[in-house]
From Swiss-Prot:
Keywords: Amidation, Disulfide bond, Ion channel impairing toxin, Neurotoxin, Potassium channel impairing toxin, Secreted, Toxin, Voltage-gated potassium channel impairing toxin. This is Potassium channel toxin alpha-KTx 2.11. Its main location: secreted. Belongs to the short scorpion toxin superfamily. Potassium channel inhibitor family. Alpha-KTx 02 subfamily. The lineage of its organism: Eukaryota, Metazoa, Ecdysozoa, Arthropoda, Chelicerata. One of its GO terms (cellular component) is extracellular region. It comes from Centruroides elegans.
């Protein structure tokens, strides 16, 4: 899931992704936007 959160590193995406997927969240930063996935 790509969310509308700007990022320069995956660490910036982890908290917003955890809000969606909980403790099983994975986060990537792609093209300046956060991508969340379930692990």
């Amino acid at each position: 899931t790509i969310i509308n959160v700007k990022c320069t590193s995956p660490k910036q995406c982890l908290l917003p992704c955890k809000e969606i997927y909980g403790i099983h969240a994975g986060a990537k930063c792609m093209n300046g936007k956060c991508k969340c996935y379930k692990i």
